[in-house]
């Protein structure tokens, strides 16, 4: 392999050179092509941005194709019209040039398409009218004159060679004749007939009127449908006279007189052929104009003044369809100088746009009100609805309510007079009858004053309604009735003890406790006694408000309940119980395990000594704790009836938490002397161990069947309570009190023991109550509480009997077994029979 390079060196080098040359050529070609394409694209985009055409470099790529040869829409005939429908008008369009658009669009919409060109000088000549075939309804020739120099146009008349005919457009789709003029061709000067010149020239004021709105100054159109049907042999002739000097008069006007000069007598073809028109040399080339062949429609025009109506012929709708094409060449030479003289001066128009007045066509029957410019304020005033001003003094007075005065001023004056008279007179010391009489007098005077100010019509109405003083709220008011009943109570009146409440309280039996006095019930709204007739008037209310203190002193005790109340009946029933108050009841309620013989509700009120000791215990509870352990008898059997109504412990028991067990044991060895004998108090037993709290689902159960001594150590919040002695203090203090009484102490003690034995004999043995578990099960089964959720099963640990590695199926089995709640565990076990580990052998 060492001689490989030596043998192939030449071929390798020549191949590399050839490849390099070809690659260079290709790269160069690609670069040049890309550069050219980029440059052309940049230039084309630049020209597009600047609005220029494509430059020469991009002309070889973008070839502009000529537009397709389509027919000119302006040469088409109008579309067919339904019977009974008016044809629409097409808007005329003018060619583009240096002349303003207003000057190029002033030809009638009924003329055929006419083109003017310097390159095609064709002079139309009038020949035999029968030589021209009639294809479409002949349009009415239009003659436009806009030059102010009428004599020059008349002198430049071209001669029309007889025997020739008008050329017809060679366009395949155009059936309307077209006239191609290179220069203006004026009409021949010919004397018109008598009928044509007799009052058929339009009023000069009509031509010079430019104050009409722009919308109504449009081109004139004449219905030519009847012309074609009545005169089919008339040649289609078009005479167009463009302005000779466009710059001098850029706003050409249409001469209406040329349309109005018509005659009833037809003109012979020989007279038309004999006319000679000279062809003048125009100073300015004519602007090519294009018009549409359209049938007329009803156009709204402004109604002409009376003078213009008189100038127009009345027989125009009957004469024009028959004689217009024949008479127009005859009447035009005489009418044109007059029309040009009227339109010689240019009209001042805004924005370089002029308008031409439009005459009403014979078929139009509708008119539109022209727009008249007004200022915004004037327009608002004109559009505002005018309301006639009504004289208020001529209107009758409105009706007055029978329970009201006719004027509010009279009411206020009467009220002021009442207040003034009441303030001046010492009405507070008067009786209700006197104050009522004074108020009635002031009412009469105020009413008289108010009626004196009224008009005679008002006084007549008030006299018809009734007398001044007797005109009350409704009906007649009797001022002689004694009005001495008390006023109604105030809404914010405090609860005071009325004499009726005092009598009821004195007649009732005294309460057991001094703090259980019943609260006075709220007063009901007082109502009128049915024995007295109800008298409603505003006068007593005013007196009662002013003399409130004096009236309250004279108020007699009155019941809050409607109807007559007998105060002689003795009311001896007990007052209603006080509303429940937790703070007072907890401090005043008897202890939970008080023996039944001390209950005052069954065996009468307790002795005063017990009440005193109960009060003293509630105040000085801690020093008396050792004496609670002293007892003559063992603790009584637990009564289940007390546990059903558990009460909150006294407020003094909260202080017992600070006491230690040593102080209780130290006082346990004390002795008590009872009737000369010494009794040693045994030591108290230790408190039983505290039970654990029940779960949350069982705390709502009735747990009164448990040990009361154990449950007493648990408070609502789970705190430990102090150890509770077996006996209450009242049992230990009673012998001490009786021992100090003297000779009667022994008898009292025996009575206490007998009462105690009787109270024990009265109570029956409590019925066998099921245990807590049975009670809770029955409570749960009754549906009052839901059973607790079962405990979660612990995961079953799987221990392998051997140290062999687990196969994949065994691992999946172990994973499934780890889920204790998997119901499909039975189906996953041994799904695949296990095999011995043949790969990992020991």
UniProtKB/Swiss-Prot annotation:
Any matching Pfam family: AIM3
Gene Ontology biological process terms from the UniProt entry: barbed-end actin filament capping
Region (Disordered): 1-25, 39-134, 338-368, 393-769, 799-842
Biased composition regions of type Polar residues, renumbered to the chain: 422-461, 654-665, 731-748
Ranges of Basic residues composition bias in the record: 718-727
Cellular localisation: Membrane raft
Membrane-topology annotation of the record: Peripheral membrane protein
The entry's keywords: Membrane
GO cellular component terms attached to this protein's record: actin cortical patch; membrane raft
Biased composition (Low complexity): 52-64, 104-117, 406-416, 525-540, 638-652
Regions of compositional bias (Basic and acidic residues) in chain numbering: 753-766
Protein family: Belongs to the AIM3 family.
Protein name per Swiss-Prot or TrEMBL: Altered inheritance of mitochondria protein 3
Gene name linked to the record: AIM3
């Amino acid at each position: 392999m060492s001689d490989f390079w030596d043998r192939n060196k030449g071929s390798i080098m020549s191949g590399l050179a050839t490849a390099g040359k070809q690659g260079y050529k290709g790269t160069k070609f690609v670069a040049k092509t890309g550069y050219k394409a980029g440059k052309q694209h940049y230039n084309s985009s630049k020209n597009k941005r600047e609005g220029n055409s494509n430059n020469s470099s991009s002309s070889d790529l973008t070839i502009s194709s000529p537009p397709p040869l389509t027919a000119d829409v302006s040469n088409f005939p109008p579309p067919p019209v339904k019977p009974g429908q008016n044809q629409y008008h097409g808007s005329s369009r003018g060619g583009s040039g240096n002349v303003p658009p207003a000057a190029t669009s002033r030809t009638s919409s009924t003329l055929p398409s006419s083109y003017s060109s310097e390159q095609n000088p064709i002079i139309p000549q009038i020949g035999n009218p029968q030589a021209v075939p009639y294809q479409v309804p002949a349009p009415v020739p239009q003659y436009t004159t806009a030059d102010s120099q009428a004599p020059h146009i008349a002198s430049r008349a071209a001669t029309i060679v007889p025997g020739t005919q008008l050329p017809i457009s060679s366009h395949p789709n155009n059936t309307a004749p077209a006239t191609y003029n290179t220069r203006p061709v004026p009409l021949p000067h010919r004397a018109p007939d008598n009928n044509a010149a007799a009052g058929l020239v339009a009023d000069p004021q009509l031509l010079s009127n430019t104050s009409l709105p722009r919308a109504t100054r449009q081109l004139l159109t004449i219905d030519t449908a009847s012309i074609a049907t009545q005169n089919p042999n008339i040649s289609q002739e078009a005479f167009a006279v463009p302005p000779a000097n466009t710059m001098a008069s850029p706003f050409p006007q249409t001469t209406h007189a040329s349309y109005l000069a018509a005659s009833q007598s037809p003109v012979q073809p020989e007279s038309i052929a004999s006319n000679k028109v000279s062809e003048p040399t125009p100073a300015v080339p004519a602007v090519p104009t294009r018009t549409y062949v359209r049938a007329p429609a009803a156009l709204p025009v402004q109604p002409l003044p009376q003078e213009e109506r008189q100038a127009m012929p009345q027989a125009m709708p009957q004469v024009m369809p028959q004689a217009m094409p024949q008479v127009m060449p005859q009447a035009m030479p005489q009418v044109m100088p007059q029309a040009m003289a009227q339109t010689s001066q240019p009209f001042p128009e805004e924005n370089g746009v002029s308008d031409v007045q439009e005459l009403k066509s014979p078929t139009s029957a509708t008119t539109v009100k022209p727009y008249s410019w007004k200022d915004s304020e004037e327009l608002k005033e004109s559009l505002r609805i005018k309301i006639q001003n009504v004289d208020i003094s001529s209107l009758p007075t409105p009706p007055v309510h029978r329970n009201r005065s006719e004027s509010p001023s009279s009411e206020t004056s009467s009220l002021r007079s009442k207040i003034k008279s009441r303030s001046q007179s010492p009405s507070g010391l008067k009786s209700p009858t006197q104050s009522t009489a004074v108020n009635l007098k002031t009412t009469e005077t105020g009413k008289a004053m108010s009626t004196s100010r009224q008009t005679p019509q008002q006084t007549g109405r008030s006299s018809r309604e009734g007398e001044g003083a007797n005109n009350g709220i409704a009906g007649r008011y009797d001022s002689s009735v004694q009005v001495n009943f008390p006023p109604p109570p105030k809404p914010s009146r405090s609860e005071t003890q009325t004499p009726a409440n005092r009598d009821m309280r004195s007649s009732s039996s005294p309460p057991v406790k001094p703090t259980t006095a019943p609260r006075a019930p709220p007063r009901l709204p007082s109502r009128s006694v049915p024995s007295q007739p109800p008298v409603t008037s505003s006068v007593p209310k005013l007196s009662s408000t002013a003399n409130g203190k004096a009236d309250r002193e004279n108020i007699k005790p009155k019941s809050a309940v409607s109807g007559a109340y007998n105060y002689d009946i003795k009311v001896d029933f007990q007052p209603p119980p006080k509303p429940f108050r937790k703070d007072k009841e907890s401090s005043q309620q008897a202890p939970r395990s008080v023996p039944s013989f001390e209950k005052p509700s069954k065996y009468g009120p307790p002795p005063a000594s017990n009440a005193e000791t109960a009060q003293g215990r509630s105040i000085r509870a801690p020093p008396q704790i050792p004496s609670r352990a002293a007892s003559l008898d063992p603790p009584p059997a637990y009564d289940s009836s007390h546990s059903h109504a558990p009460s909150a412990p006294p407020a003094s028991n909260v202080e017992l938490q600070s006491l230690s067990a040593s102080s209780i044991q130290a006082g346990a060895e004390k002795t008590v002397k009872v009737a000369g004998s010494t009794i040693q108090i045994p030591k108290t037993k230790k408190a039983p161990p505290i039970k654990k709290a029940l779960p949350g689902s069982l705390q709502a159960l009735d747990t009164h069947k448990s040990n009361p001594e154990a449950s007493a150590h648990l408070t609502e919040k789970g705190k430990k309570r102090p150890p509770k002695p077996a006996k209450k203090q009242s049992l230990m203090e009673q012998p001490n009190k009786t021992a100090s009484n003297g000779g009667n102490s022994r008898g009292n003690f025996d009575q206490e023991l007998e009462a105690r034995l009787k109270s024990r004999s009265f109570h029956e043995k409590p019925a066998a109550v099921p245990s807590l578990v049975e009670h809770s099960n029955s409570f749960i089964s009754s549906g009052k509480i839901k059973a607790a959720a079962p405990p979660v099963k612990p995961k079953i640990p799987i221990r392998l009997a051997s140290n062999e590695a687990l196969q994949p199926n065994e691992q999946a089995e172990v994973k499934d077994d780890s889920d204790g709640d998997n119901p499909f565990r039975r189906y996953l076990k041994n799904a695949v029979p296990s095999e011995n580990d043949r790969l990992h052998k020991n």
